[in-house]
């Protein structure tokens, strides 16, 4: 317990008092490169604590990344796995099949990937099957 007491009562106050924090707004522009380097560690600690607090107290932040890996957002959601069988003999000349899961005409592509590509910067397109 004594080492913790020493850090809290002596080391930390000495460190914080030695930081080059200017008295005025204009003083920030007069800091040297060495002074800016000395300010990096406490800034990183404060930013880390702020981010950790944000994650702890903002429910939307905790579940923001959970749904991002899902590509199918609407097609046959009641099934465990979406599988569609199409016989090659049933294809007249060629058929374009959706790969982006945005189509309203599943499993065929209706061009919905174009809007998806514009919004996300993606480059997804259909799978085109041709009859020989």
UniProtKB/Swiss-Prot annotation:
Under Pfam families, the record lists: MitoNEET_N, zf-CDGSH
The entry's keywords: 2Fe-2S, Endoplasmic reticulum, Iron, Iron-sulfur, Membrane, Metal-binding, Transmembrane, Transmembrane helix
Question: Where would you say this protein principally sits, based on its record?
Answer: endoplasmic reticulum
Cofactor: record remark: Binds 1 [2Fe-2S] cluster.
Sorted alphabetically, the Gene Ontology BP terms of this entry are: intracellular iron ion homeostasis; mitochondrial transport; regulation of autophagy
Q: Which domain of life is it from?
A: Eukaryota
Cytoplasmic face residues? 59-132
The stretches that face the Lumenal side, renumbered to this chain, are 1-35
Q: Does the keyword Methyltransferase apply?
A: no
Q: Which cofactor does it need?
A: [2Fe-2S] cluster
User: Can you quote a single GO CC term?
Assistant: endoplasmic reticulum membrane
UniProt record similarity statement: Belongs to the CISD protein family. CISD2 subfamily.
> Sorted alphabetically, which PANTHER family does this protein's record hold?
CDGSH IRON-SULFUR DOMAIN-CONTAINING PROTEIN 1
Q: What protein am I looking at?
A: CDGSH iron-sulfur domain-containing protein 2 homolog
């Amino acid at each position: 317990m004594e080492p913790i007491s020493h850090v809290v009562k002596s080391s930390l106050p000495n460190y914080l008092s030695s930081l080059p924090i200017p008295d005025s707004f204009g003083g920030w522009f007069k800091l040297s490169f060495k002074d800016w380097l000395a300010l990096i560690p406490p800034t990183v600690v404060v930013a880390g604590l702020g981010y950790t607090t944000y994650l702890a107290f903002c429910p939307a932040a905790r579940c923001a990344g959970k749904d991002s890996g899902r590509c199918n957002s609407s097609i046959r959601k009641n099934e465990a796995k979406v599988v569609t069988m199409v016989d090659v003999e049933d294809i007249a000349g060629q058929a374009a099949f959706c790969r982006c899961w945005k189509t309203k005409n599943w499993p065929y592509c209706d061009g919905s990937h174009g809007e998806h590509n514009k919004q996300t910067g993606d480059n997804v397109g259909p799978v085109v099957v041709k009859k020989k």
